[in-house]
């Protein structure tokens, strides 16, 4: 999993999300969980802060842009996935001591891969086997980029994605699955 972090430049006077009132905050895109949906729900629920009412939202397009924007002083504050931040530090793109976290969320499930419910069971078995037997050590570039990953794990939508559904509900998003 990963966490959503609200970050500022290390030299920033901001110590808490409550201090963003009247400022501009960078998000990635409106469809991003950690780059918009989760921070919006958290800011509203925990700090009574709502975009356009209490602060001005801006969109960077992706987590890397938000991180670089804070790092270079283009954005005062941003919401990002810390897995992206950690990879940028490992690759030497940014120096860790130039960024400071003022909020970290609970852990969210990471990217999920699924299959259609009506696939032939034999094909489902082969797909699962391909994932669960993947050799993470066979590719040095993969190992460098995803240093913490050492296996795929099975997930259950009902339990493991509950936090994502709660965030969507807090943001007024509902699904009509048929």
Each PLM stretch: what is its role?
Residues 26-32, 71-75, 114-116, 149-154:
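Second-shell loop/turn segments in exported
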Residues 20, 70-71, 113, 127:
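Hydrophobic residues within well-ordered alpha-helices
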Residues 114-115, 119-178:
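An extracytoplasmic/periplasmic, membrane-proximal ligand-sensing/linker region
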Residues 53-56, 89-107:
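Short beta-strand->loop
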Residues 1-68, 75-77, 83:
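Bilobed "Venus flytrap"/periplasmic-binding protein-like clamshell domains
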Residues 3-14, 108-122:
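A bilobed periplasmic-binding-protein/Venus flytrap-type ligand-binding module shared by bacterial periplasmic
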Residues 82-83, 117:
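Short secondary-structure boundary segments
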Residues 44, 48, 71-76, 90, ...:
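Sec-exported extracytoplasmic/periplasmic mature domains
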């Amino acid at each position: 999993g990963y966490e959503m972090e609200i970050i500022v430049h290390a030299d920033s006077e901001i110590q808490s999300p409550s201090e963003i009132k009247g400022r501009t905050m960078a998000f990635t895109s409106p469809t991003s969980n950690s780059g918009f949906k989760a921070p919006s729900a958290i800011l509203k629920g925990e700090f009574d802060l709502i975009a356009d009412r209490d602060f001005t939202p801006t969109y960077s397009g992706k987590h890397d842009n938000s991180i670089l924007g804070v790092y270079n002083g283009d954005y005062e504050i941003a919401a990002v996935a810390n897995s992206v931040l950690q990879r940028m530090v490992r690759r030497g793109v940014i120096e860790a001591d130039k960024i400071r976290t003022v909020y970290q969320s609970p852990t969210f499930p990471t990217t999920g891969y699924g299959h259609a419910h009506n696939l032939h069971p034999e094909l489902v078995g082969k797909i699962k086997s391909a994932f669960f037997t993947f050799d993470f050590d066979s590719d040095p570039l993969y190992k460098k980029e995803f240093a913490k990953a050492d296996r795929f794990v099975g997930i259950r939508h009902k339990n493991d994605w509950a936090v994502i559904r709660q965030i969507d509900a807090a943001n007024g998003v509902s699904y009509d699955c048929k």
